[in-house]
Every structure is written in structure tokens, then in C-alpha cells.
């Protein structure tokens, strides 16, 4: 099955790295440099809804948490799996993600791209929420 994956990160190198991983597996990937860019695309009439959004926490402008709050408030991409992909591994950040009903939280520094890909696929294919 082909999934539509949205990647949101201000680090262009990481965006490209993850995009290649998902594209090579046959998935449709769109990258965004920040939360505002993602929200603008989701609000645009006729935009295809993503199956998953991988969202960095710390970005210029809106944080990933603020972005997800706006998405929830406006019912944007309501059926998408939301996975935080961040270097922020503090328990308070993980708790914030849970409060916002994120489906997963991956710490970039301790996960190679193939692990990020595998966890995303697990969640998309009906895996339980990460704890």
C-alpha cells in the first residue's frame, strides 16, 4: 500500500534523508520547512489529506506542538497518524505529545532513518500508540 507522508522539519538535510527513505519504498512524500507551511497547505482547498505527519518539535515560528494544536482545533488531517520526530527527549515533551493525542514520539538522535520508517509503517498499519 502507498501512503501519503508529510514531513515537517526546519533541517533540510534531515527532510531530504527521510524523504528519500519513504520515496524509495514507494510512498508519496511532501516536505515542509515549518508548521506555518504545513498549515497553509492543509487549509488549501483540494489538498489531499496525509496518512501520516512526521513533525519536529523545535522549529522557528511555530513549534510542532503549536502546529498540532492548530491542526486539532481546525480539524485538519484529522485521520492522519501524527508522529513527533524530535531531538527533544525530555519527559515533559513526550507528555505534551500524549496530551495532544500524538500517535508516536521518536527521538531523532537515537533512531536511524530505517527505524523511523519502520515505526511510521507500524503505526500506519494498525500498530498501537507508542507509550
Task: Please report, for each region that a protein language model flagged, where it lies by residue.
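Conserved acidic segment of CheY-like receiver
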Residues: 2-13, 18-22, 53
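Receiver (REC) domain active-site loop signature in two-component systems and cognate sites
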Residues: 59-60
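Receiver (REC) domain switch/output surface
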Residues: 115-129
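Active-site residues of response regulator receiver
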Residues: 56, 86
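Acidic, metal-coordinating helix/loop segments flanking the phosphotransfer/catalytic sites
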Residues: 31-52
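Conserved phosphotransfer cores of two-component systems
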Residues: 44-48, 72-79, 100
